[in-house]
Structure formats: structure tokens, C-alpha cells
Amino acid sequence: FYRNHKVTSIVEQRPVWSENPPEKEGRMYQVQADGEMFLAPIVINAAGVYADEIHNMICEEKIRIVPRRGEYRLMDKNCGDLVNSTIFQQPSKMGKGILVTPTVHGNLLVGPTAEDIPDKQDVDTTAEGLAKVLNLGSNSVDALDGRQTITSFAGLRAHLVHEAPAEKSDFLIEEAAGHPGFIDVAGIESPGLTSAPAIGEYVARIVENIYPAERKTDFIDSRKGIPSMALATEEEREALIRENPAFANVICRCELVTEGEILEAIHRPVGATTLDGVKRRTRAGMGRCQAGFCSPKTLEILARELQLDPAQITKEGIGSEILVGKNKETAPGEGGAWKKPQAPVGKEALHE
């Protein structure tokens, strides 16, 4: 797994025309990504809002994806029982509209908006968008209280745009014409999350038809979840602590997440390397205080276990570093050591 490697070019390497399948005729794709070069007979383009850029590197027939931003409010768990099922509104050409839904962990989720924007990295929330979420959500559940919002966020849906009305407008899942082994999984809008397992199986069948392979006899078809102290019985908690005392060290008080759970999240295959990675695997930081209490401890554990300087630990990848240095050391852009400001005296002290 090569994380944080931006693909900059894809070149198809193929010999003179042949009736043989790609793996026998030597057809390969050369993928350049942040100084690394990868060769593969099959490329699966599942790049979300960037899927058009990947597709257009190799295909003559171009596609265009417009990022469609959706803003959400996540409400406190004391609102989780306001509804017991998802409440939908009248759908429109932009989507299913503002919904109100209980989450599996007991919160209440309200949203999303739908707004086409030009920037594929713009996941900022807006005052107007969040007000719209609350106002329209209140049409379904009049007891919604904006003061119970514990966090808000925005995501981007990959809206596939075609000039010709007859062209497919979403769920482009197919082998690209004229480019065997290059598979698009693009324009996945609602219900993309629900469809994800079926999409995976469908793409696997496409791959099997292109590149026949034997099924593994020792394939592990299930994954043991990370133990949850919040959901465990008293007996299960005691057993976990006896096996590993780290399960007795509570890191996130809001969601009752322990050091033992965070260690499992870090050291599993394709383990967590960021604060958000830990959060998504364990819920550490997803509670009412939104990591105000646990983030320093989680950062410390990540740095220790990954053998990195704490300043290298990020929230969600490159560019989201949390620390800039240690107190009382040279500050960025300054020539001398940090000095404590002098306390004001005289009239200045009165104004303070």
C-alpha cells in the first residue's frame, strides 16, 4: 500500500496487435506517482472526484466530474431517539434532499445539502449551508435543536457530467473502450454507500474475465473486529484487561475508548497512522468534546508506536500536521529561543 502518492501520469504499454488476453500479450500500464513507477496489467480507477482526471490520462473519450458538496450536522446522542428510522424529504435532481437519521452509535445525523462547486478539495462548511440543514431538517422533525450540534462537516460527491443527455449520468462501472484492463468505477452517487459491497463483487468479476486467476483456498472471508470496551460486558472487560492491561487505560472518555483499542487499530494490517484513522476505527474523538480531551494522548500513542516525532503526526494526512514544535524552542521564522512575555506594569496592567 502506497499512501499519499498522487498519480501524475498513466501510459499504456502494449506490443503489436494480438488476439491474446492482456496478461499473455504483455500489455501493461505504467503508473507514475510521486516519483514511484508502478507496472500493472490492470488499473482500477476509483478516484472519486478525481476519477475523470485519471480516466482522461488514458482514454480518448473524455469524461467530466463536478464535485457536489454536501454539508451535515451531527447532533449529540441525547437527540438520537428523536426518530427511529431515516426520514426522507421530496427528492430533486440534486439528490435525496435533507434527511434526518439516527446513527448506529446513537447520534442524530441531519443533511446533506447539495451544491455544485469548482474546487475538488473544498470540504469547508458554510454558515448558509448549515442553516439550510437545520431549517429544512426541521420540516421533518420540528424538535431539532441546533445547540445540540457537536460537529459539522462536508463531503464531496462525484457528479458525472456528460454533454449528451443520453449518456450515463452516474455509476460508470466498466472496462474502458479500447483499453483492456483499465476499469472505471466513477460517478458513484447515492446510493453509493449501500451499493459498495455489490460494486466490489461486480468489479471482481470484470477482473476475473480479463485476468483469470485461481481462487485462494486459504482466503479469510471475515475480519475480527477491534474489541470495544463501550459495548463489552463487565466479564468481557475484565478478560480484556487481564489479557492486556492497556484496555484499562481510558483515552477517550466520551466514547470510552481505551489504549488497548487504539493499539489494535495501529498495529493491524493497513493500520491507522493519523488521528482520523484512529477515530474511524475506534471512535476515539467522535464524542461530545470532539477530541478536546483525547487528541493529545492519541497523538502521543501514535508517535510512540510508529516511532515518529510527534510533529510528524497528522490529523488526516499531509498538510494537516498538528504540532509545529516544542515550547521554549525556536519558533518557525524566528532566530532566537521563545521567551515568556513580560507582565504589564502601571497603567498597562490596569487595561489588562
Model-identified regions with their sequence ranges:
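Hydrophobic/aromatic beta-strand patches that form the interior of the parallel beta-sheet core
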Residues: 2, 44, 183-185
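Iron-sulfur (Fe-S) cluster-binding segments and ferredoxin-like electron-carrier domains
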Residues: 121, 258-269, 292-310
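Short flanking/linker segments adjacent to small metal-binding domains or redox-active Cys/His motifs
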Residues: 294-302, 330-352
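A conserved beta-strand/loop element that lines the FAD pocket in flavoprotein oxidoreductases
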Residues: 1-9
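Flavin-dependent oxidoreductases
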Residues: 10-15, 26-111, 115-126, 135, ...
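Short Fe-S-cluster ligation motifs
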Residues: 279-295, 312-338
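C-terminal catalytic lobe of FAD-dependent flavoproteins
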Residues: 91, 95-97, 104-105, 116-250, ...
